[in-house]
Amino acid sequence: MEPEIKIVNVVVSTQIGTDIDLEYAADILDNAEYEPEQFPGLVCRLSDPKVALLIFRSGKLNCTGAKSKEDAEIAIKKIIKELKEAGMEIIDNPVVSVQNMVATTELGMEPNLDDISTLECTEYEPEQFPGLVYRLSDPKVVVLIFGSGKVVITGLKVIEDAYIAFDKISATLKELEQELY
């Protein structure tokens, strides 16, 4: 049975120009904050799609909080449109690349994290963090497994890797269960 995997955060980056005047951009963009003594970039929050965009003087733009790459691209297009309408030199259709995606799913059981922690590439320090950290090399992702059966997969570049990672973890847990019980 295919697990229900839900993307909860997509982080993308792009280049929208060079030498961006962040003070001016902060004045023209709604919901923008620019406090260079606290953070070197301009932070702009949109409500539809609900994302945060970080714009740096170098022209680099990061978008976080999107539920899909498409939502991030919509948000970036909105910001580009506003900046261009204000007379700023901005790249029209910048290449957007996914830096990280975070997905959640469920194992469908309550795993024994102490047992799983005997596997290679795992870390489990319940006094410090309630989840078991399982680092996979192919795909190169980090899987957090909680005692409730909830799973968080991070480090994704494509959604397909979430399914591959989940299948690998599920198979490994089945093998471990057969060895132990």
Curated annotation (Swiss-Prot):
Protein name (database record): TATA-box-binding protein
Molecular functions per Gene Ontology: DNA binding; DNA-binding transcription factor activity
Similarity remark: Belongs to the TBP family.
Spans of repeat Sequence: 7-83, 98-173
InterPro entries assigned to the protein according to its UniProt record, in alphabetical order: TBP, TBP_archaea, TBP_CS, TBP_dom_sf
Keywords: DNA-binding, Repeat, Transcription, Transcription regulation
Pfam family, one: TBP
Biological role: General factor that plays a role in the activation of archaeal genes transcribed by RNA polymerase. Binds specifically to the TATA box promoter element which lies close to the position of transcription initiation.
Protein origin, superkingdom: Archaea
GO terms, biological process: DNA-templated transcription initiation
HAMAP family (UniProt xref): TATA_bind_prot_arch
Biological source species: Methanococcus vannielii (strain ATCC 35089 / DSM 1224 / JCM 13029 / OCM 148 / SB)
